[in-house]
Amino acid sequence: MLAKAAASASSSMEKGSVYLDFTDIKCIQYTSSIRKLEQLVHVCKVLLRNLSMKSNENLIPLSNIVIALGSGFQFNVSAAIEKRIELLSQFRSCKANATNLPLSTTSLKLEVDLVPVEEDSVLFVSKFYNKELQSQLLTTLQRVAEDSLQIYQARIRQLTMERNSNRPTDLSGRTTIFNEDALNDLLSPNELAFGLDLLVNIRNRSTDTSSSAFFALALPILEKFRSNLNDKCIPPIRSYYTSIMKFSRTKGVFSNNVLIQLPYWQFTLHRMYAASLRAKCLIDVIRAVLRQIYIPNKHHFHDNTTKLHSKNLHEYSELLEELETFCFTQELEKDLIEAFKSYGNQNTVYQVQFNNISSAYQRLLLKSTQMLRKAAKLVDSFSTQWKSISDNMKASKYDDMNIDEMAKMAEEKLAVDELAYNEKIKEQERQREEKKNSSLSQKNTSSSSSITSNSSSLNVSPNILSPLRLSRTSSVSRSEESRSPSSPIPFTDAKSNISAKKTRSVRTRNRSSSLQSVSSLEDTSTARNGMRSNSLQSGSLNTQRIVQNAYSKALLSLNEKRGPRLTPTKLNNSIRSKSPSPTVSRQNSVKQRNKVNILKLNEVDEDDINEKFHDLKLDDDTLIVSQEVLSPEGSETPKIIVSVADDNQSSSNNDSEVEGIVKKVRFIGVPPMSQDENPEPKRRGWYKKPAVLHYPPPPAQHSLQKFRTTQEGLAFRTSLISRDQGSDKKFGFDSMYSSGQGADTKIVGKIKDKLFK
C-alpha cells in the first residue's frame, strides 16, 4: 500500500486522463484502417451503381486514381492482399476470393512500397481509357477492400477483449474504454470523397482518348485533388497541430490549463498518435496520385516546348527535380517510420504528462506535419506551374521552330530566368530582414520605455519627501539626500498668481471620520496629536510621486522652450507659509518680485543653478489635510512660487528672496486610546476589548503588491496630462488641473481616497 501511494504521489499524470500503451496503438491502427476501407467500399459501390444506371453513356471509371486515393498501410494486413493491390494499380487483374487468415492482433507494417507505374504514355493511355478493364478493376477493388475490412473487424473485437482483460482498473473497479469517438475528426478519410467524381464521359473516341487528351485531363484531376486536400484533409490536422504547439510552449500550471481545453484531452496522446498516423497516410496518398499523373506525362513535362511556355524556367526546373525526388524515393520518411516503431514497444506505457506530450510532439506530430506540409506545397506548385503552362500554350508561339532552336532558346531562357529568380529571392530576404529589424526596433523601444517608466516609479526612496522625515528634520537644515537635485520640486508660473481682487471658488468635500475640523493651522496641528487615524505613509508616497512627475514635466518643458545653445537661467525659490487671509500689500510685493525675475537673462552658470536647486524645498503646507472652506470673496489657495527667466527678456538685479518657514506636520502614527474613548466596563461579566482589536490587521502580501501597483498606475496617469494647457500656464501643478481644482486640493483628495480605502 505504501509503495502504491508513493507511486501515485510521484506521478504527475492528469486526473481522469487515459495513458497510451502498445494495445491502444494497435487499436488506433485498426480503427484508422477500418475507416479508410469502409469509405473505399462506399466509393466503389457508388461508382459501379452510376455505371449501371447510365449504361447508355460512354462513362469510364478512373479506377487507377481511386486505388491511389485508397492506398496506404491498411492493405498490409496480409501479404496476399498487398500483392493484389499492387496488381490492380498496374491495370492487371487478380483474384477476388476471400483470404483465410488466422486471427491475430499483431501491429501493422507502416511502410508502403512504391507500386510500379507504366512510363510508356501510349500503353498507359490505352489502358486508362479501356472501359471494360477499368470497370473490372473497380469491382475487384471493392471485393478486396471488403475482405480486408472483415479481417480488421475480427481483429478489433479480439483486441478490445484483450485490452479490457489486461488493462488495470480505476478506483471504481472499471476499465477505461477505448473511445473511438475521440479520434473521429482526425481519422476521417476525406480524400476518398474526391473519388466520387472520377467518372469520365467520352464523346469522341478518336480525340478524347489520345495522349494529348490525357495530358489535358490530368490537370483538372490534379486541381480537384489539390482543392480536396486543402479544404477537407489538411485542416483537421493543422488545427490540432496548432493546439498542441501552443501547449508545448507553456510550462507549469498554465500548461495544465491549456491541456484541459483541448478536445478529448483525456486521450491527448492517442489523438497525437492518430494525427501523426493520418498525416503519414496522406503523404502516401499524395505520392500515389502524383505518380499516376506525373510518370505517364513525364516526357511532356520535360519537353522543350513545355519549358519555353513556363513562367520561370528556373523555378520550373526545380519543381521537376522535387517531383523526381518525391515520386521515386522515400528517404524523407525513414526517420518518421523509426519514430512510429519506437512507440510500438510492447511493455511501454505513456502517461498524459507534459514530458510525454512534448516528446510525442517533437518526434511524431511535428515531423509528420512538416512532411505533409512539404507534400501539399509540392502539389500546389505543380498545379500552379502546370496551369500557367497550359494558358501559355494556347498562343502556340513555338510551333514553327525546329528542335535545335528550341533547345538553344530553352538554355537562354533558363539563364535569364535564373537571374530573375535570384533577384526575387534577394528582394524577399531583404524585405524579410527589414521587417525583422523594424519589429525588433519597435520591441526595443517599447521595452526601453517600459523600463524607464518602471524605474521612475519604483526607484524612489521613501525617505526623500515622506512626511515622517519632514516632521523629524529641522526646519533650517536638511540632509544631502533630501537636498539632492533629483528631489522633486513643484513648479508654478508667476503669471498664474491671482490677485486678491479676483475670487476663486473651492470645491468642498466630505469630511473624514478620522480628521477634525479646526479654524486655523495651529489648531489643526495640535488637535491631531490625540486623534485616531490611519497612517498617511502610503499617501505621502503618492504625493511624492505626483510632485516628482510635475517637476520632471516642468523641467522638460523649460528645456524645450530655451533652445539648445542657451544656458539655464537663475531659479529663485520663494517658499511662503500658508496664510489664511493674505493682505493686499503682500500680494503686490509678490507680483513685483515675479515681474523682476521674469526679466532675467541667461547670465548664470550651471553650478549656480545647481546650488539653487539644492536650496529648493517642498512646502509642507501641501501635505496638510486642510478642511477650510474658503469664502468666494478675496480667498486664495496657498501657492509655492518658483520664478523662471524668459529667453527674450533682459536681466535685473532687483531679485529678493524670502526666508521660508517650514512647519512640522505630525504623521508619526496613532496614539493609544484615552480613558474617555475606551472606559472600563462597569457591568458584571464584561471585559475591556484588547487594544489590538482597535487597529486593522497588517495587510497580506498580495494586498501590498496590489496597492503598490495602484500607486504606480496613479502616478502614470498623472504623467500623461498635457504640460501646456494655456498660453499663460507654462508648467506647474495648476497647469495640470482645471481652474476650480488646485494642486493642494488634488493632493488632499488623493490622500483621503487612500485613507477611506
Curated annotation (Swiss-Prot):
Residues 427-541, 558-590 are annotated as: Disordered. It is found in: Cytoplasm. Keywords: Cytoplasm. One of its GO terms (cellular component) is cytoplasm. Residues 501-510 have a biased composition (Basic residues). Residues 427-437 have a biased composition (Basic and acidic residues). Residues 522-541, 569-590 have a biased composition (Polar residues). It comes from the Eukaryota. Interacts with GLC7. GLC7 phosphatase-regulatory protein involved in GLC7 subcellular redistribution and chromosome segregation. This is GLC7-interacting protein 4. It comes from Kluyveromyces lactis (strain ATCC 8585 / CBS 2359 / DSM 70799 / NBRC 1267 / NRRL Y-1140 / WM37).
